[in-house]
Amino acid sequence: MQVLSSLKSAKNRHPDCQVVRRRGRVFVINKTDGRFKAVQGKKKK
């Protein structure tokens, strides 16, 4: 899963990508191809 500061490019990478909000974070999920998962925020140290 990618950790990105902006999800605009992540949601346009595949037609099936959708933006969802879970646990106060914004995720991009793709049920047909799991390579396109992403989350918005900072990386953990």
Curated annotation (Swiss-Prot):
Source organism, top-level taxon? Bacteria
GO biological-process terms attached to the record: translation
Listed Pfam families = Ribosomal_L36 (PF00444)
| Keywords per UniProt | Ribonucleoprotein, Ribosomal protein
Q: Name one GO cellular component term.
A: ribonucleoprotein complex
Q: GO molecular function terms here?
A: structural constituent of ribosome
InterPro entries in the cross-refs: Ribosomal_bL36, Ribosomal_bL36_sp, Ribosomal_L36_bact
Q: Which parts of the chain are coiled coil?
A: none
Keyword presence, ATP-binding: no
* Family to which the UniProt record says this protein belongs: Belongs to the bacterial ribosomal protein bL36 family.
Extract the HAMAP family matched here. Answer: Ribosomal_bL36 (MF_00251)
Q: What is the protein's given name? A: Large ribosomal subunit protein bL36
